[in-house]
Design a protein with these regions (language model features):
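Short acidic/glycine-rich loops and adjacent helix/strand connectors
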Residues: 1-174
Length: 174
């Protein structure tokens, strides 16, 4: 028996809950191919109604900034989250204007010309580096205000997008 990654997340959130109806939003790096999904649950019926597929991923966007700020992908994301309160979201507009496009329905696409994670050995490329003023921070070197501001910026952008997705999910329930 095999269950899709995002459907498993949705089921494990809904079925033990006290709710009879729910909108379930699942976001992560990537499941089999899905990175973001919206499921609607009514009674015992659970159906995924919307998906966004790899390489377009809020989780991988966050992991890209984890890499760029000098931390290890898939284990250092909490450090980026911890840095965010010490910075200002001065790069948020650049992220919104250059790296990600968000549609009215909450769906999004990354401009993959800035990223190498789908085809290369690193998360970013020279175009990404130029956008943020230089190469990634070397791991274990001193943190600067730039890393704190980058963390605050990606945190703000992703929080805003998630709020849009939640609004879409809520409207899908009505």
């Amino acid at each position: 028996l095999f269950s899709e990654h995002h459907l498993s997340h949705a089921a494990s959130a809904f079925y033990p809950s006290p709710f009879q109806n729910a909108a379930i939003l699942t976001l992560d790096g990537v499941g089999e191919w899905t990175t973001t999904s919206l499921a609607i649950a009514k009674g015992s019926d659970l159906k995924v109604v919307k998906e966004i597929h790899f390489p377009h991923s809020l989780g991988l966007l966050y992991s890209t900034f984890t890499y760029y700020t000098g931390f290890k992908v898939n284990s250092g994301e909490y450090k980026v989250m911890g840095l965010a309160p010490y910075g200002e979201p001065v790069y948020a507009d650049i992220i919104r204007e250059k790296l990600i496009t968000v549609a009215e329905d909450g769906s999004f696409q990354l401009d993959m010309s800035y990223f190498d994670y789908a085809t290369g050995l690193t998360m970013t490329n020279k175009k990404f580096d130029a956008l943020f003023g230089g190469p990634p921070r070397t791991p274990e070197t001193e943190l600067t205000q730039r890393e704190m501001d980058l963390a605050a910026s990606v945190q703000k952008v992703i929080e805003d997008i998630i709020l849009e997705l939640v609004s879409v999910a809520k409207s899908g329930m009505n």
